């Protein structure tokens, strides 16, 4: 009787996993055309919001029938001012007095993009295995406990100090993520629920360590949760002069992107990850230990979030605070979705969202509310996550349907 119940439970879990994997494949295998159209629609809707709430446009609309040219001119000026400010704040400042100041925006975009790329790679890895890792924020927080301790409490030589801190961050985050994989493998607990709950645990643990004397609280601190700045031997140095804040975190992000590509596309373990993500039942039948794969996949996914934590912790000039994670773990979900969980796509998506963060303040200067840019980001992700919607809007063709694994196997047997 118990064996039958166990078999029914396994069938139900496999069915749930298969449905989730089908949804993920539909989202992640979208064409570049659909991605570009999603971005375009997001910017168009953002332009509508800018126009709809601009006082000059509303004033011109009051007499549009008498002088329609004024209304259209006000609309054009509002949109060009808004997105022009985004360009100047994120790519190249055409109003700067010298070249060094003009290229500062692109360095800020790269600086903001680096941690989102690294965390996005981790989320994307989980997606490729059919796992929804919603816990990158908690994994970063737990990793920050280790990286902050190493960078502020331990003395090591230059370069070695940074490397040890990065390794500790990866190990801490990987262990925290491995807990999720273990619980899923042994108890069937859903990774979404577990990661959300562990986010709270890790964030509160991190704050407790920052608030407690003798742990991570800064020397002479009065109880405000804040650590000392990382030691000079541990801090990631700037890539260029002190005029720019871009640091070696960008190099770390590029290296992580190449490693992710090799891991998922060329390595044996990456092949197992993809097999389990495509069809866990078929993977199990072929001899792959699915439960063990879940554990390793969640650990690897979290390890990339640990790199993002190292990026944040080793560049905090004023010391680490509880908000240093900056919700990068949640932004990474959108980056992974937009990038289709592929290495190159995630890198480009990280650059786009880094540009949003770098250019947002410039848009506020010209009167565009920051919430409008958030709406643009949300709409882009919504269209990426709802393929039928963007196909209906632009009348794109339906993607070819994949044959089930069982049918492919029967067909190959008949040919033999």
Segments from the language model and where they lie:
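Helix-loop-helix "hairpin" substructures at the membrane interface of multi-pass membrane proteins
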Residues: 175, 242-319, 343-344, 348
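Transmembrane helix-bundle core of multi-pass membrane transporters
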Residues: 85, 199-266
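Cytosolic-side transmembrane-helix boundaries in multi-pass membrane proteins
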Residues: 1-42, 46-55, 278, 285-293, ...
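Membrane-interfacial amphipathic/re-entrant helices at transmembrane-helix boundaries
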Residues: 3, 7-8, 16-116
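Transmembrane alpha-helical segments in multi-pass inner-membrane proteins
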Residues: 299-378
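Hydrophobic alpha-helical segments embedded in the membrane of multi-pass proteins
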Residues: 113-124, 139-145, 174-178, 197-200, ...
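Alpha-helical transmembrane segments of multi-pass membrane proteins, especially transporters
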Residues: 30, 34-35, 108, 112, ...
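Single transmembrane alpha-helix segments in multi-pass membrane proteins
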Residues: 49-51, 55, 80-154, 170-192, ...
């Amino acid at each position: 009787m118990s064996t039958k119940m166990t078999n029914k439970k396994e069938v139900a879990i496999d069915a749930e996993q298969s449905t989730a994997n089908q949804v993920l494949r539909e989202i992640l295998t979208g064409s570049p055309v659909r991605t570009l159209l999603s971005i375009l629609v997001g910017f168009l809707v953002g332009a509508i919001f800018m126009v709809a709430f601009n006082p000059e446009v509303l004033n011109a609309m009051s007499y549009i029938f008498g002088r329609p040219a004024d209304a259209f001119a006000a609309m054009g000026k509002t949109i060009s001012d808004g997105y022009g400010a985004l360009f100047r704040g994120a790519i190249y400042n055409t109003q700067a007095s010298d070249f060094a100041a003009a290229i500062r925006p692109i360095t800020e975009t790269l600086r903001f993009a680096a941690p989102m790329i690294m965390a996005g790679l981790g989320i994307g890895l989980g997606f490729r295995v059919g796992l929804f890792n919603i816990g990158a924020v908690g994994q970063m927080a737990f990793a920050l406990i280790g990286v902050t301790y190493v960078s502020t409490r331990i003395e090591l030589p230059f370069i070695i100090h940074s490397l040890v801190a990065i390794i500790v961050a990866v190990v801490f985050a990987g262990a925290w993520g491995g807990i999720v994989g273990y619980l899923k493998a042994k108890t069937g607990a859903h990774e979404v629920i577990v990661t959300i709950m562990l986010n709270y645990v890790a964030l509160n643990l991190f704050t407790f360590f920052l608030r407690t004397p003798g742990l991570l609280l800064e020397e002479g601190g009065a109880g405000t949760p804040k650590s000392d700045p990382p030691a000079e031997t541990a801090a990631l140095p700037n890539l260029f002069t002190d005029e720019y804040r871009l640091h070696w975190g960008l190099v770390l992000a590029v290296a992580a992107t190449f490693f992710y590509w090799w891991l998922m596309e060329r390595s044996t373990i990456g092949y197992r990850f993809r097999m389990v993500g495509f069809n866990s039942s078929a993977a199990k039948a072929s001899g792959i230990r699915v439960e063990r794969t879940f554990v390793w996949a969640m650990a690897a996914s979290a390890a990339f979030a640990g790199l993002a934590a190292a990026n944040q912790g080793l560049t905090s000039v004023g010391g680490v605070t509880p908000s240093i994670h900056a919700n990068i773990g949640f932004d990474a979900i959108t980056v992974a979705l937009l990038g289709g969980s592929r290495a190159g796509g995630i890198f480009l998506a990280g650059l786009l969202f880094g540009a949003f963060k770098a250019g947002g303040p410039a848009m506020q200067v010209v009167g565009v509310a920051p919430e409008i840019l958030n709406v643009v980001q949300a709409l882009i992700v919504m269209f990426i996550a709802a393929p039928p919607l963007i196909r209906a809007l632009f009348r794109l063709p339906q993607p070819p349907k994949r044959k089930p694994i069982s049918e492919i196997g029967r067909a190959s047997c008949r040919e033999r």
